């Protein structure tokens, strides 16, 4: 069984925030708290350690009280570059990732991904949800992987690859069904952020 203490959580906050007008998504307040802090609180309860991947506003992220790692791959190469930065610093046998703008991620996310890896003898696990229209949606930016995956990730990135799904599919991959698609909602725009703020006030 993969123990909680052998899993490092990695919050991916290294993007450009282009869909949010270039602002740093992880530092945008939701209910008065930075979004990345909401994600940190959810993820840290499920893992032995937590890292944050960020490429700007490092002091702000360091104030969260966990180590901050920056991309070693240049030019904002996407979430896989952030995953590599995490794996380069990971001190446990496993690492699980989550984007900084996922403040509602399931509280049993890591446990269920780890259990599926054990049951299916898989290497990587990602969630899959069914949206309101009945469409099956994989959530590859939420990924539990062994620390040893660093070698294949380096090779994939060096070959110009940037898609999580393609890299993940090169491993023994298990997709784990989750009923609550809203728990994986990313807040990508300021309008979406304001919508969630309004829902909170209305409730």
UniProtKB/Swiss-Prot annotation:
<feature type="binding site">
    <location>
        <position position="101"/>
    </location>
    <ligand>
        <name>Mg(2+)</name>
    </ligand>
</feature>
<feature type="binding site">
    <location>
        <position position="71"/>
    </location>
    <ligand>
        <name>GTP</name>
    </ligand>
</feature>
<keyword id="KW-0460">Magnesium</keyword>
<feature type="binding site">
    <location>
        <position position="53"/>
    </location>
    <ligand>
        <name>GTP</name>
    </ligand>
</feature>
<dbReference type="Pfam" id="PF12804">
    <property type="entry name" value="NTP_transf_3"/>
</dbReference>
<dbReference type="InterPro" id="IPR029044">
    <property type="entry name" value="Nucleotide-diphossugar_trans"/>
</dbReference>
<dbReference type="GO" id="GO:0046872">
    <property type="term" value="F:metal ion binding"/>
</dbReference>
<keyword id="KW-0479">Metal-binding</keyword>
<dbReference type="InterPro" id="IPR025877">
    <property type="entry name" value="MobA-like_NTP_Trfase"/>
</dbReference>
<comment type="subunit">
    <text>Monomer.</text>
</comment>
<dbReference type="InterPro" id="IPR013482">
    <property type="entry name" value="Molybde_CF_guanTrfase"/>
</dbReference>
<dbReference type="GO" id="GO:1902758">
    <property type="term" value="P:bis(molybdopterin guanine dinucleotide)molybdenum biosynthetic process"/>
</dbReference>
<feature type="binding site">
    <location>
        <begin position="12"/>
        <end position="14"/>
    </location>
    <ligand>
        <name>GTP</name>
    </ligand>
</feature>
<keyword id="KW-0547">Nucleotide-binding</keyword>
<protein>
    <recommendedName>
        <fullName>Molybdenum cofactor guanylyltransferase</fullName>
        <ecNumber>2.7.7.77</ecNumber>
    </recommendedName>
</protein>
<keyword id="KW-0808">Transferase</keyword>
<keyword id="KW-0963">Cytoplasm</keyword>
<keyword id="KW-0501">Molybdenum cofactor biosynthesis</keyword>
<dbReference type="GO" id="GO:0005525">
    <property type="term" value="F:GTP binding"/>
</dbReference>
<dbReference type="GO" id="GO:0005737">
    <property type="term" value="C:cytoplasm"/>
</dbReference>
<comment type="similarity">
    <text>Belongs to the MobA family.</text>
</comment>
<feature type="binding site">
    <location>
        <position position="25"/>
    </location>
    <ligand>
        <name>GTP</name>
    </ligand>
</feature>
<keyword id="KW-0342">GTP-binding</keyword>
<feature type="binding site">
    <location>
        <position position="101"/>
    </location>
    <ligand>
        <name>GTP</name>
    </ligand>
</feature>
<dbReference type="GO" id="GO:0061603">
    <property type="term" value="F:molybdenum cofactor guanylyltransferase activity"/>
</dbReference>
<comment type="function">
    <text>Transfers a GMP moiety from GTP to Mo-molybdopterin (Mo-MPT) cofactor (Moco or molybdenum cofactor) to form Mo-molybdopterin guanine dinucleotide (Mo-MGD) cofactor.</text>
</comment>
